[in-house]
Amino acid sequence: LIDQLNAATAPDTYAYVDVDAATGQVNALGMDAIRVGLLYKPANITPVGRTAVLNTPAFVTGGDGEARNRPALAQAFEEHATGERFVVSVNHLKSKGSACSAPDTGDGQGNCAVVRTNAANLLAQWLASDPTGTGDPDVLIIGDLNSYALEDPIVALGRAGYVNFIEAFRFMGGGYSYIFDGQWVILTMPWATPR
């Protein structure tokens, strides 16, 4: 992907966080065909601190006994123009489609809501522990949380002190991030520590 992006733009316009090389772990982000990753523009920002992966059984299974969530990635960056630092955490929580051991409760959150909620709580705890070792409190959570705005995983992130960018700033002209079957909803949303 990086080669294609750089071919379409200019050499070295984009780079990626090589998680296995940075952590010394083979398949640190798992072996599934779907994995998280992090691309960036090295002309604007530089990775700093440790590349961190949350791939504990408790997080990946969400308490379900089988791998359900993708391992999470955290990387701190320093912006060249200002010297400011921030941490980006990329995530992909369990989808609503296939079943887990905990049945769909019929509350509208779909299958595996408890798995996503457990993962959101563990993610917030992990990020609070400074996994990148930079001591920087500015954290941006991105990726596919597979949860709508008022579902339990999202509420858990709010309780942990994170702010929903779409709600806070009314991005995208009306507060939605996903359209499916004619419904406009907030599904994949960035979260950040308040400043």
What residue ranges belong to the model's regions?
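Divalent cation-coordinating acidic motifs and surrounding scaffolds
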Residues: 1-195
